[in-house]
């Protein structure tokens, strides 16, 4: 008698809809589902996929990073599209005129973009303006920017590991003995 095929790993794990029950997000999903199906543009498919993503996979994009990315050659007069939040950066003094589209824009970032003569679109306005994503630049925030990523990687204490250990506090008595001081065994 043959062994039956194992079906336990058959399922493809990817989101087919957003986890959130936010009705406005669901409406955007409806709109971009239609656009992704009816247009042959990859832009709409990428936006749809990103609308499904979790909060940690939609990290906020700072104003400074957006300005830096939009200054690159060939990106003049294009719309910056962010499936996520745009936040303010106080380190930036001059904000150029920008045209942006995002799910959310923090209040200070909003006032600074508009003060510079820029324009802020929502995704439904973007769908009317460029249904195929023409004249847009898709941007996203740094996914590995969260503090938790510092704890990932090679175990702390092993050679060439720069992983942050989970320590109660950073005092003299905490993870400062063997392997950290030459007087206590060895130091690496």
UniProtKB/Swiss-Prot annotation:
Q: Where is this region: Disordered?
A: 150-188
Comp. bias intervals (Basic residues): 161-171, 178-188
Any single biological process term in GO: cytoplasmic translation
Superkingdom field = Eukaryota
Give the modified residues of type Phosphothreonine: 158
* SUPFAM superfamilies listed in its UniProt record: Ribosomal proteins L15p and L18e
**Gene3D superfamilies, sorted:** 3.100.10.10
Record keywords, A-Z: Cytoplasm, Endoplasmic reticulum, Isopeptide bond, Phosphoprotein, Ribonucleoprotein, Ribosomal protein, Ubl conjugation
A Pfam short name:
Ribosomal_L18
Location of the protein in the cell: Cytoplasm, Cytosol; Cytoplasm; Rough endoplasmic reticulum
Q: What does this protein do?
A: Component of the large ribosomal subunit. The ribosome is a large ribonucleoprotein complex responsible for the synthesis of proteins in the cell.
The entry assigns this protein to a family as follows: Belongs to the eukaryotic ribosomal protein eL18 family.
Annotated protein name in UniProt: Large ribosomal subunit protein eL18
Q: Which organism is it from?
A: Rattus norvegicus
Q: What is the lineage of its organism?
A: Eukaryota, Metazoa, Chordata, Craniata, Vertebrata
Q: Which gene encodes it?
A: Rpl18
